[in-house]
Every structure is written in structure tokens, then in C-alpha cells.
Amino acid sequence: MTKLLVGLGNPGDKYFETKHNVGFMLIDQLAKKQNVTFTHDKIFQADLASFFLNGEKIYLVKPTTFMNESGKAVHALLTYYGLDIDDLLIIYDDLDMEVGKIRLRAKGSAGGHNGIKSIIQHIGTQVFNRVKIGIGRPKNGMSVVHHVLSKFDRDDYIGILQSVDKVDDSVNYYLQEKNFEKTMQRYNG
């Protein structure tokens, strides 16, 4: 069995640790814990790392297509490795949730998130496992684009680091249990 864990974000130093890149932050955390490094794959348009856990190959993926085209990389990897939608887990930011809150879902619409919209368009379904990390709504009349592409303030950054640890725990639990429904019940409470 193989699992594809995809963190959504934008490539490049300009976007490092911005709100829209919390998916990348989590995937980086998982790679660090597994002591694996990323290599860039031009064909898949993604940075990839992999490791084995309980006899299962786990791919960590950071699409380099920029957020709005993330579905290209996800679809290419699913197709190449012959994976089912059940083998996919997407990790991304959600501005409709409080900063640091997490929510696991097995299906749903894009909810205005262009990366998720691209994935739904490319894989042809809204039914796939996902972990959403809250980044909060813009404050003081700030545009949504400026908000998601800005860095966290100090207090929010501390909350995000705590949520990254909780998401890391939930992903590891999911990989051990091989049951997303059970993982949702445990971590959505």
C-alpha cells in the first residue's frame, strides 16, 4: 500500500511561512521527523520525499505548480502510482476557521480555496480525505489575497505551531490506524 500526503502552498522563499503555506509547513514537519529530504521532480511538478511506515510507502508532496494549479501534481501522482482516492490526504489552510483550529473531513466543496478547487477539477471528485488548518479571516479591511499571502503575527504563529503539532499527531494516528473515519472521530472532538 502507498499513501500520498499533500501539503498545499506556494513554492519559493517569498511565500515561506505565509498563511497560505501551512500545508507546506506540516509536510516539512513530517519530513523532519522522518529524517527525509525533498527532491524536485519536474515531471510531477512537485517536491517529493518518501519513507516507509509499517510496510507502507508514504509520499510527502509539495506541489510546485503554485496553489491554483495544485490539482495537476496531485492527479499526475495518483495516476502514475495507480493510487485510489482513499490513498490521498490533502493538508491546507482554511480562512473560515479560527487560527490554529483543525478539522478533518472526508469530503466537501472547495469552499473558495483555489488549491482545493484545482484538485477537485483534476481528480473529478470532492470525496477525498483532508485536514484543514484555520488561518482566520482578514482583519481591518485587508483583502483576502493580502491576508493569505502574509506571514502570521507572533501570537498567531504560536497557535499555528501548536496546530501543526496536533495535525502531525492526527496524520501519524491515521497512518498507524489506516482508518480516516476513526481519525476524524478522535481529532475533530
UniProtKB/Swiss-Prot annotation:
<comment type="function">
    <text>Catalyzes the release of premature peptidyl moieties from peptidyl-tRNA molecules trapped in stalled 50S ribosomal subunits, and thus maintains levels of free tRNAs and 50S ribosomes.</text>
</comment>
<dbReference type="Pfam" id="PF01195">
    <property type="entry name" value="Pept_tRNA_hydro"/>
</dbReference>
<dbReference type="GO" id="GO:0000049">
    <property type="term" value="F:tRNA binding"/>
</dbReference>
<keyword id="KW-0820">tRNA-binding</keyword>
<feature type="binding site">
    <location>
        <position position="66"/>
    </location>
    <ligand>
        <name>tRNA</name>
    </ligand>
</feature>
<keyword id="KW-0378">Hydrolase</keyword>
<dbReference type="GO" id="GO:0004045">
    <property type="term" value="F:peptidyl-tRNA hydrolase activity"/>
</dbReference>
<feature type="site" description="Discriminates between blocked and unblocked aminoacyl-tRNA">
    <location>
        <position position="10"/>
    </location>
</feature>
<dbReference type="InterPro" id="IPR018171">
    <property type="entry name" value="Pept_tRNA_hydro_CS"/>
</dbReference>
<feature type="binding site">
    <location>
        <position position="68"/>
    </location>
    <ligand>
        <name>tRNA</name>
    </ligand>
</feature>
<dbReference type="GO" id="GO:0006515">
    <property type="term" value="P:protein quality control for misfolded or incompletely synthesized proteins"/>
</dbReference>
<comment type="similarity">
    <text>Belongs to the PTH family.</text>
</comment>
<protein>
    <recommendedName>
        <fullName>Peptidyl-tRNA hydrolase</fullName>
        <ecNumber>3.1.1.29</ecNumber>
    </recommendedName>
</protein>
<feature type="binding site">
    <location>
        <position position="114"/>
    </location>
    <ligand>
        <name>tRNA</name>
    </ligand>
</feature>
<dbReference type="GO" id="GO:0072344">
    <property type="term" value="P:rescue of stalled ribosome"/>
</dbReference>
<keyword id="KW-0963">Cytoplasm</keyword>
<feature type="active site" description="Proton acceptor">
    <location>
        <position position="20"/>
    </location>
</feature>
<dbReference type="InterPro" id="IPR036416">
    <property type="entry name" value="Pept_tRNA_hydro_sf"/>
</dbReference>
<keyword id="KW-0694">RNA-binding</keyword>
<feature type="binding site">
    <location>
        <position position="15"/>
    </location>
    <ligand>
        <name>tRNA</name>
    </ligand>
</feature>
<comment type="subunit">
    <text>Monomer.</text>
</comment>
<feature type="site" description="Stabilizes the basic form of H active site to accept a proton">
    <location>
        <position position="93"/>
    </location>
</feature>
<dbReference type="GO" id="GO:0005737">
    <property type="term" value="C:cytoplasm"/>
</dbReference>
<comment type="function">
    <text>Hydrolyzes ribosome-free peptidyl-tRNAs (with 1 or more amino acids incorporated), which drop off the ribosome during protein synthesis, or as a result of ribosome stalling.</text>
</comment>
<dbReference type="InterPro" id="IPR001328">
    <property type="entry name" value="Pept_tRNA_hydro"/>
</dbReference>
